[in-house]
Amino acid sequence: MMAHELPLSIHTKKSNHNVPPSKAPSAKTNKHKPSKSGSDDRGLPNGGKVDFGNKSGSQTNKKSNKKTSKHTSSNTSNNKGVTRVLPDGSKPNFGNESSHQNGGNHKKQNNEPCLPNGEKPNFGEGSKSHSKKKNNDHVLPNGEKPNFFNEKSSKKATKPKEKKPLITEDTYAGSSFHSSPAALNLPKPSFKTSPKTNDAKQHTTEPNYHVNPQVNTPPQHSVNVPPQHPVTTYPAGNGVPNIPTVPSNPTAFPPRNHYAQPGFSYYATPQGYINYQYPQVPPPPPPQGGVYPMVAPQYQQQPQQHPQQHPQPQPQPQQLPQQHRPHHLPAIAAPQQGHRISFNELLGSSKS
């Protein structure tokens, strides 16, 4: 079945009928009826009359305001008679007291807030003099005044800068040097060669000027005269050989510069040998048989002797002991009877 096809009971009992209650008189019924008394006037919760913008309403509003002012004044008068006290015995301050003293104290307290340490805070609203005093009061532990770099420099403190005169003359590189009077006394540059170099060139170009060839090359036939007291060096512990202090007509070649050694006269051969020249000694008297013993030829190597072992005397021409002869160098026997030979003859004899 559909909803509209539901059966409806037509016959109902009288007990089931609900009688609606009597309606209270609505505002619509009383709308056009005049108000009987002023007690029906509507008012605000504080007792004031509602003003709907009508003239009559404005007049009634003034009356209601007067009534409310009277009501509040009566309440305050009643409150004055009753003194309220806090549990600690002090009088409470609700902020609505009209006494001049209390109001002045309250204003002072509000206008002068204090920090916990008792100082007055500075919110930047104080006068300039007050802020300057506070800045002057700050002092570092060492007694110096702190500098926060927030103070504006006064115009009086700054000195006016002196204006330098502008140079209007034409300037160029070196103008300051040329304009100075001391520059005139300086010597003028000359591009000529110095006289020393000219003299040196003249000496070299002269025909009489010649270079000594013996400066760079060692002389071969010059005689080197040893000093009277030659200085010799010997290693420690070796015996000093007995050498006559005054040699008789020694003939030796001068050594080279890098072979120079004090107390010795020697020369170097092209083969690289160094020959020491010993002073000439007269030969000993001939033996009884009239025959001299055999003499070792020149440049013949002899067994090397220790410097401490002195040679034993033999019936042959006396020879001086070896004076620190370098190793690998031949011993040279003195020529018989003081015979002199040249360097070329010496080379020829060595080749033969």
Swiss-Prot record:
- Alphabetical list of InterPro entries matching this protein: PNRC-like_rgn
Q: What does UniProt give as GO cellular component?
A: cytoplasm
GO terms (molecular function) for this protein are: RNA binding
**Where the protein is mainly located, per its record?**
cytoplasm
- Annotated coiled-coil positions are none
Region annotated Disordered, chain positions: 1-258, 277-352
Looking at the keywords, is Isomerase present? Answer: no
UniProt entry keywords in alphabetical sequence? Cytoplasm, mRNA processing, Nonsense-mediated mRNA decay, RNA-binding
| Compartments reported by the entry | Cytoplasm
**Membrane-crossing residue ranges in chain numbering:** none
Q: Which GO terms describe its biological process?
A: mRNA processing; nuclear-transcribed mRNA catabolic process, nonsense-mediated decay
Listed Polar residues bias regions = 93-104, 205-225
Q: Where is the composition biased (Low complexity)?
A: 71-80, 289-309
Q: Which family does it belong to?
A: Belongs to the EDC family.
UniProt function note: mRNA-binding protein which stimulates mRNA decapping.
Quote the protein name from its UniProt record. Enhancer of mRNA-decapping protein 1
